[in-house]
C-alpha cells in the first residue's frame, strides 16, 4: 500500500494547536530544488528507544535506492529527538476523524482518511510555547526544501496482500466450504457407488471438514477479529496462535495417516480384481499380492508420517524438509502409476476406439457420432483426473520451494487436493466398472453376434458333431462373401433387442420336453409289459430298445443342430430310424430360417436365463 502524507490534515492539526488560518493552507507539490545536495539527517547513534508512532512490530519492505530523505527520519530528527518530552507521533489508519479547537468549542472539522496518516501532537502547556511555529516550519520544510521518500509503510503494521490475514482467512474459508461440499457429494451418491460404500472415505472426508471448520472459527475469533478492529494485519500471529499449537499439529498428522490408509485400500481393491478386499492380518496367511501391498504401503506410510511429525515440531531443519518432500512425491508417484496401470490393464478394451464397430460407409460424421456416444462420459472424466494429478505435483513442489515460515498455511491446498484425489479415484473406478458392465451386456447377452468380432467363435468350427461341422464348413465356403453385408453397427444391434426365434428353447421348455418324454417312456414300458402284446421273449428286446432310446433322450441335451442343417442331413438316421412327425415339422421350419443366414452373422446367442432384457432401457 502506498503511504503518503496528508499535509492538509497536518495543517489542520497545527491549527488545532493555536495557529489561526493555518487550515486554509493547501499542501503543495514537492519540488526538488536544483541546488540542493541531499544528505542524511542527523541521527543519534545508540538511540534504542522505540518511536511513539510504532504501535506494531516493524516490517521490512524493499525500497528503491533513491537519494532522498526518509519521512520517518525527518520526523525523528526534527521533532522527536529535540522535543521527546513534549511531542508524540501516532499513526492514524483509514477511517473517520473529527477535530475540534480548544478555543472554539462549537466548531468541529470532520474528515475521512482513506490512507494511513501521521498525527503529530505537541503540548502547548509546556515551558516552550512555540510548538505551533515549530510545526509550521516543519511542514514548510518537507514541502519545499526536501525530497521526501515515504518509508512509513514499515510502521503501519500491515503485511503484503498475499501474506495478509484477509488472504489467509479467505483461503481457509474456501478450503472449508470445498471439503464440506465433497462430504455432501459423498453422502448423496447412489448406494452402489464406492464412495458411498467405503466408510474409510467417509471418515477421512468428514474429519478433514471438521478440523478445517474448527480452526477457521478459531482464526476468525482470536486473530482476524482483533486485527480488523485495530486495522492492521500480522500473519505471524496466525502462525503462533494457530499453526504452532499442539491440537493443530495432531489433527494434521491424523489427516495424513487417514490419507495413506485410503490410498493403500484403493491399491488393494484394484489388485483384488475389483472384488471386496479380504483383510487377513496374519502375515503368513496373506496372499502374495496383498502381502506386498500391505508391506510396502505400511513402510512408506510409516516413513512419511514420522518425517511429517518431526517437521511439524521442528520446522527449521532444511534436510528434514527435503527428505519429507521426496518421500511424499515418491508415494504419490507410485500411487498414480498403479492407478494408471490397473486402469489400462482392466479397462483398455473399453477405452480403445477399435472396440467400437464403425459403419461401413466410412464417413467421418458417423465415426465421430459413434465415438461421442461411447466416450462422452469417460474422456472428460479421465481429463479431469489427469488435471488434478498434475495440479497436485505442481502445488507440492511450488509451495515447498517458495514457501517460507509465515506461509505454511498454503499447504492446506495440498491437503485439500489429497482429499479430492481420493474421492475422484473411487469415482473413476466406479464409472469404468459401470461402463464395463454396460458394454458386456450390449456385446454378449441377447443380441446377434457378428462373427467378425475377434471375441467370438468362428462358425465354421465343428462344435456339436463331426457331420454337422463338415456340413457347415461346406455351406460357408461355397457362399459368396460379398453377396450379403451387415448394414447395422454394434450400437444399432444392441439398442434393437428383438424376441428370440422359434428355434430357440428356454430351459423351462426343455424341462417340459423332458417330462413329456418321461411320460411317453413310462407308457411304452407299461405297453411292453402287457401280456396281450405278445410273449415275454418277444417283448423283452423291444422293451430294452425303448428304454435305451429314451435314456438317451433324458440326458442333458446339447444344442440341437436341426436349426442350421438341411432336412436331408438330419431327417435320416444312420440306422434307418424314422423321425417323429412333430420333429419333422420343426426341422422344416428350421431349414426355412437357415436359408436367410449371412456368413458374417450368426444366430442369436443362447442365454442362461429365461428372458432377453432390453438393457438400453434397464439402465
UniProtKB/Swiss-Prot annotation:
Subcellular location: Membrane
Residue ranges, Extracellular side: 1, 189-203, 313-321, 400-410
Designated gene of the protein: DFG16
Name of the protein this chain belongs to: Protein DFG16
Location, primary (coarse class): membrane
Any one of the GO BP annotations: cellular response to pH
Bilayer topology term: Multi-pass membrane protein
Induction: Repressed by zinc.
Keywords attached to this entry: Membrane, Transmembrane, Transmembrane helix, Zinc
Pfam families referenced in this protein's UniProt entry, alphabetically: PalH
Residue stretches of biased makeup (Polar residues): 485-504, 526-549
Bias (Basic and acidic residues) ranges: 44-54
Domain of life: Eukaryota
GO cellular component terms given for this protein: plasma membrane
Keyword Zinc (UniProt): yes
Residue ranges, compositional bias (Basic residues): 552-561
Region (Disordered), start-end ranges: 33-54, 485-506, 520-586
InterPro entries listed in its UniProt record: PalH
Function summary: Involved in invasion during filamentous growth.
Amino acid at each position: 500500500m502506498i503511504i503518503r502524507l496528508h499535509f492538509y490534515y497536518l495543517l489542520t492539526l497545527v491549527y488545532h494547536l493555536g495557529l489561526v488560518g493555518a487550515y486554509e493552507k493547501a499542501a503543495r507539490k514537492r519540488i526538488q530544488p536544483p541546488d540542493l545536495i541531499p544528505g542524511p539527517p542527523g541521527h543519534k547513534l545508540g538511540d534504542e528507544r522505540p518511536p511513539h508512532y510504532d504501535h506494531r512490530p516493524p516490517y521490512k519492505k524493499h525500497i528503491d535506492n533513491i537519494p532522498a530523505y526518509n519521512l520517518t527520519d525527518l520526523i525523528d530528527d526534527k521533532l522527536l529527538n529535540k522535543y521527546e518530552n513534549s511531542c508524540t507521533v501516532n499513526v492514524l489508519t483509514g477511517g473517520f476523524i473529527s477535530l475540534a479547537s480548544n478555543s472554539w468549542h462549537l466548531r468541529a472539522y470532520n474528515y475521512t482518511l482513506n490512507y494511513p496518516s501521521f498525527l503529530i501532537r505537541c503540548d502547548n502547556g509546556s515551558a516552550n510555547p512555540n510548538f505551533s511555529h515549530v510545526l509550521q516550519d516543519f511542514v514548510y520544510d518537507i514541502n519545499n526544501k526536501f525530497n521526501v521518500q515515504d518509508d512509513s509503510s514499515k510502521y503501519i503494521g500491515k503485511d503484503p496482500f498475499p501474506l495478509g490475514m484477509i488472504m489467509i482467512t479467505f483461503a481457509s474459508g474456501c478450503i472449508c466450504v470445498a471439503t464440506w461440499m465433497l462430504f455432501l457429494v459423498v453422502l448423496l451418491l447412489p448406494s452402489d457407488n464406492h464412495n458411498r460404500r467405503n466408510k474409510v472415505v467417509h471418515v477421512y472426508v468428514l474429519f478433514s471438514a471438521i478440523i478445517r471448520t474448527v480452526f477457521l472459527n478459531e482464526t476468525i475469533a482470536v486473530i482476524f477479529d482483533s486485527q480488523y478492529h485495530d486495522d492492521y494485519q500480522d500473519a505471524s500471529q496466525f502462525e503462533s496462535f494457530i499453526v504452532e499449537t499442539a491440537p493443530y499439529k495432531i489433527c494434521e498428522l491424523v489427516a495424513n495417516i487417514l490419507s495413506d490408509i485410503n490410498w493403500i485400500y484403493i491399491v488393494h481393491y484394484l489388485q483384488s480384481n475389483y472384488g471386496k478386499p479380504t483383510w487377513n492380518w496374519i502375515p503368513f496367511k496373506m496372499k502374495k499380492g496383498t502381502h506386498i501391498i500391505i508391506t510396502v504401503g505400511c513402510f512408506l506410510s510409516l516413513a512419511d508420517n514420522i518425517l511429517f511429525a518431526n517437521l511439524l515440531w521442528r520446522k527449521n531443519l532444511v534436510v528434514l524438509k527435503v527428505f519429507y518432500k521426496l518421500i511424499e512425491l515418491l508415494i504419490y508417484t507410485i500411487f498414480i502409476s498403479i492407478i494408471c496401470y490397473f486402469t489400462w490393464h482392466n479397462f483398455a478394451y473399453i477405452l480403445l476406439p477399435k472396440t467400437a464397430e464403425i459403419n461401413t460407409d466410412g464417413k467421418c460424421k458417423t465415426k465421430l457420432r459413434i465415438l461421442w456416444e461411447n466416450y462422452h462420459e469417460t474422456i472428460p472424466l479421465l481429463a479431469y483426473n489427469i488435471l488434478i494429478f498434475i495440479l497436485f505435483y505442481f502445488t507440492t513442489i511450488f509451495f515447498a520451494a517458495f514457501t517460507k515460515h509465515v506461509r505454511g498455511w498454503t499447504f492446506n491446498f495440498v491437503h485439500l487436493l489429497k482429499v479430492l484425489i481420493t474421492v475422484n479415484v473411487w469415482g473413476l473406478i466406479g464409472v469404468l466398472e459401470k461402463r464395463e458392465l454396460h458394454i458386456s451386456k450390449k456385446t454378449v447377452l441377447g443380441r446377434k453376434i457378428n462373427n467378425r468380432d475377434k471375441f467370438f467363435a468362428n462358425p465354421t468350427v465343428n462344435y456339436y458333431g463331426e457331420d454337422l461341422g463338415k456340413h457347415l464348413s461346406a455351406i460357408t465356403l461355397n457362399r459368396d462373401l460379398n453377396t450379403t453385408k451387415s448394414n447395422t453397427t454394434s450400437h444399432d444391434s444392441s439398442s434393437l433387442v428383438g424376441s428370440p426365434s422359434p428355434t430357440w428353447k428356454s430351459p423351462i421348455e426343455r424341462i417340459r420336453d423332458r417330462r413329456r418324454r418321461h411320460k411317453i417312456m413310462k407308457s411304452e414300458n407299461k405297453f411292453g409289459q402287457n401280456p396281450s402284446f405278445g410273449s415275454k421273449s418277444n417283448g423283452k428286446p423291444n422293451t430294452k430298445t425303448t428304454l435305451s432310446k429314451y435314456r438317451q433322450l433324458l440326458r442333458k441335451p446339447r444344442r440341437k443342430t436341426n436349426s442350421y442343417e438341411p432336412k436331408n442331413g438330419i431327417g435320416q438316421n444312420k440306422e434307418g430310424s424314422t423321425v417323429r412327425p412333430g420333429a419333422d415339422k420343426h426341422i422344416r421350419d428350421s431349414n426355412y430360417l437357415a436359408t436367410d443366414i449371412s456368413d458374417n452373422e450368426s444366430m442369436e446367442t443362447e442365454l442362461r436365463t429365461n428372458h432377453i432384457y432390453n438393457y438400453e432401457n434397464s439402465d
